[in-house]
Structure formats: structure tokens, C-alpha cells
């Protein structure tokens, strides 16, 4: 299963690692490069981008994703905007 996780904080990072260990293809997305660097060798792909910028989504394989998880916890506004953009751009199951 191809899963994209937005937000690589404590929850998002541990979820990405667990889902990878169970055989899923996981793409992790965060706006902080240090978090991307921490996980980039442990999951399929890690991308540094601002998920509130709709134009940044061109780099993501959203159409191929089975599930999209929004794990942005510290910025509620960013989580809502990210969820709205994802809903507009793909038909994957969204967990937010």
C-alpha cells in the first residue's frame, strides 16, 4: 500500500517507521529539513515542502496514493489547509 504522511513530528515519524516495517511504501513530508534528514534513509521517500502551498504538490505522487495521513499536530491551521488541498487533488482515503 502506498501511504503519504504529512508531518514528521513524534506521531508522524513513528507511524511512518511502523508502516514501513509492515511492508508499506511510505512517503513522508515535512517542512523542516532536519526531520526529513532524520527519516530519509528509513522510508521510501522523504520530501521537504510546505504542505499549505498548493503548487508544491506537483512533486508528490498523490494520484498513486492509497491513503494520505495528515499528522500535523502543532499547527491546526496548517493541518486544515493541508487536508483541504489533498481532498481537492486526490481520491485517496484521507486520515486527518
Predicted regions span which residues?
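Cytosolic regulatory regions of ion transport systems
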Residues: 1-96
Amino acid at each position: 500500500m502506498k501511504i503519504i504522511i504529512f508531518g514528521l513530528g513524534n506521531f508522524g515519524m513513528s507511524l511512518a517507521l511502523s508502516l514501513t516495517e509492515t511492508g508499506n511504501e511510505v512517503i513522508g513530508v515535512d517542512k523542516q529539513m532536519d526531520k526529513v534528514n532524520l527519516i530519509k534513509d528509513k522510508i521510501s521517500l522523504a520530501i521537504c515542502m510546505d504542505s499549505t502551498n498548493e503548487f508544491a504538490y506537483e512533486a508528490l505522487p498523490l494520484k498513486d496514493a492509497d491513503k494520505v495521513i495528515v499528522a500535523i499536530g502543532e499547527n491546526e491551521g496548517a493541518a486544515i489547509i493541508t487536508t483541504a488541498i489533498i481532498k481537492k487533488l486526490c481520491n485517496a482515503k484521507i486520515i486527518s
